[in-house]
Amino acid sequence: MQADDFIRKWSAGSPAHALGERAGAQADFIDLCRVFGVPEPGDPDSYCFERGLTKTGSTGGRTDGFADVWKRGCFAWEYKAPGRSLEAALKQLVMYALPLESPPLLVVSDRQTVEVHTHFTGTPSERHVFRLEDMTRPEVQQRLRALWLAPESY
């Protein structure tokens, strides 16, 4: 898939844009993998959709949850439907970080915007924002491809 095709498919007003959060998340992520020429999730122990976890709350209660996409040593990724709060998605990922082996990048997306939040031990977090319409730019593609291939470059 080419970046232009991806933008057309996921732009506001398209049938794909109208997909619900869960159906849209996996389809969008697979398309991103194809645009960037990286493998799709397929190993429940290192790179998968719906990575299960159990988090412990401040009162000691335990809650089960799932990260939409997880790649060991690279990222945890949480999707929201277009227009929904990416801040809420980030809060969710921050709570999930420890049970997910503290990935160095926390990524949130509403399929129109991808926000990459660095989560490196001992350093302040940085936020990098990429918009759907910018996906054809080579420098944006290079930065996003680095999520899979060189997370330390963030």
Residues of each region from the PLM?
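Short, basic/polar, glycine-containing "phosphate-handling" surface segments that engage DNA
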Residues: 1-12, 59-63, 73-74, 79-94, ...
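Charged, often low-complexity linker/regulatory segments
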Residues: 1-47
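Low-complexity, compositionally biased segments
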Residues: 24, 31-34, 46, 71, ...
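Active-site metal-binding core of divalent-cation-utilizing nuclease and nuclease-like domains
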Residues: 39-72
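Short linear sequence elements within intrinsically disordered, low-complexity coil regions
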Residues: 11, 33-34, 41, 52-54, ...
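N-terminal, well-ordered alpha-helical segments
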Residues: 26, 30-34, 51, 67, ...
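Acidic-residue sensor for enzyme active/binding pockets
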Residues: 21, 50, 78
